[in-house]
Amino acid sequence: MTQPLAPIRVQFAKAGNHYRLEASVSRLLPREVPQVVAAFTEVWTKPEEVECLAVGGVSGEAMILTLIAEHELRLNERPADIAHALTYAIWQKLDRYVKVTVETTYLGESPDAHFEYGEDQYAKAYGARFEN
């Protein structure tokens, strides 16, 4: 026996809300990196890419951390909601201010896109004539 299909609205919600999220956090101490990764994982998903860049003159003094991952937004959730929640989670875990920059990129097909190829397009492509 086959399993019943999920409601259509849920399928569309999942298919149409795929985003790449890139968060940059600066100035971090090296010991704070695991806390930021944990906050990112709790709010969004486990990062697929983690990049650390030392800033300032002395290595190990301060860092810029960039985390990148792709994931689905939940129903009725907006990218701004994720950015807000992630920023506050990082501040709460560190118990101090750090600059957080979040970039979201929509990865799905445009929900407003509609393509229709009729007689006019066929005639242009192949030089055909249609008579009614």
PLM region spans:
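A common structural junction motif
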Residues: 40-51, 87-95
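Structured domain cores in non-transmembrane regions
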Residues: 31, 43-54, 58-64
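Short amphipathic beta-strand and strand-loop transition segments with alternating hydrophobic
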Residues: 3-13, 50-58, 104-105, 113
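Charged interaction segments
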Residues: 62-132
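Short glycine-rich, basic-tinged beta-strand/loop micro-motifs
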Residues: 14-27, 56-74
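Surface-exposed flexible segments
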Residues: 33-44, 110-119
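A short linear-motif detector with a strong N-terminal bias
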Residues: 1-3, 44-46, 79-81
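Short, extreme N-terminal segment that most often corresponds to the first beta-strand
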Residues: 1-42
